[in-house]
Regions:
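Hydrophobic alpha-helical segments and their helix-loop junctions in multi-pass secondary transporters
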Residues: 48, 85, 89, 107-133, ...
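Transmembrane-helix boundary/entry motifs in multi-pass membrane transporters
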Residues: 20-51, 68-74
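Juxtamembrane transmembrane-helix boundary signature
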Residues: 2-31
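Membrane-interface helix termini and inter-helical loops of multi-pass transporters
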Residues: 61-69, 121-137, 202-204
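Membrane-interface loop-to-helix entry segments
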Residues: 62-63, 75-76, 88-119
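Extracellular/periplasmic helix-exit of transmembrane alpha-helices
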Residues: 11-17, 148-149, 183-204
């Protein structure tokens, strides 16, 4: 988790600084600057694919949530998410940033609260340790897992972090933003990990 947090801070700072230097309005100038025209164009396709995949998962997840929590048809949840997404995008880049600024702290706070409740209601530590020892190892290489986690989170974020860096006034703001954002994501990751670690036996 510490490695993930450091990498979030580092790559977030690099991407926003490039966006500030290159005066970008999209991710394309950044990936071309880093990888050249050929690799940059390929990266553009990859980022677009990741964004489309994330959008599809988000819409499907909203449908599943509406069905599970409210016993409504999944299509209603998907249509609701599509409507909110379209309205947000039509509002421009500032509208997207405002929505992220509202949702992201709420998600991190929710993860922390769930983790705290899980810790307070968990069995004694000795029982947890015993159950973990008897449990098969899910990921054997923590470094490789950290790199993969960072990769699929950072790649689609370039399209937001680049233009966001362009709107900042100096490197100090970029540095502070990357630091706070990385720490926040690290706290969220730690909270999720602790919850899954303790409740792994109940996950099916």
């Amino acid at each position: 988790i510490f490695t993930v947090t450091v990498l979030f801070i580092y790559f977030g700072y690099i991407i926003m600084e490039l966006g500030w230097k290159l005066n970008v309005s999209s991710h394309l100038p950044i990936v071309r600057e880093v990888g050249g025209r050929l690799i940059g164009n390929f990266s553009d396709v990859v980022i677009t694919f990741f964004l489309f995949g994330a959008l599809t998962a988000m819409i499907a997840g909203a449908g599943a949530l509406f069905h599970q929590e409210f016993d409504l048809h999944p299509l209603l949840g998907s249509l609701f998410m599509v409507t909110v997404t379209v309205i947000t995008v039509l509002g421009g880049f500032n509208s997207i940033i405002n929505s992220i600024s509202f949702v992201a702290p709420f998600l991190v706070l929710s993860a922390v609260i769930v983790s705290i409740v899980t810790l307070l209601t968990a069995p004694p530590l000795s029982q947890i340790e015993q159950s973990v020892i008897e449990r098969p190892v899910m990921l054997r290489n923590w470094l490789w897992a950290s790199i993969l986690y960072i990769s699929y989170n950072i790649i689609p974020s370039i399209s937001i972090l680049g233009p966001l860096g362009n709107q900042t006034q100096n490197r100090k703001i970029i540095r502070n933003g990357a630091l706070l954002g990385g720490i926040g994501l690290g706290i969220g990751a730690a909270a999720i990990y602790l919850t899954l670690y303790i409740k792994a036996d109940s996950i099916k």
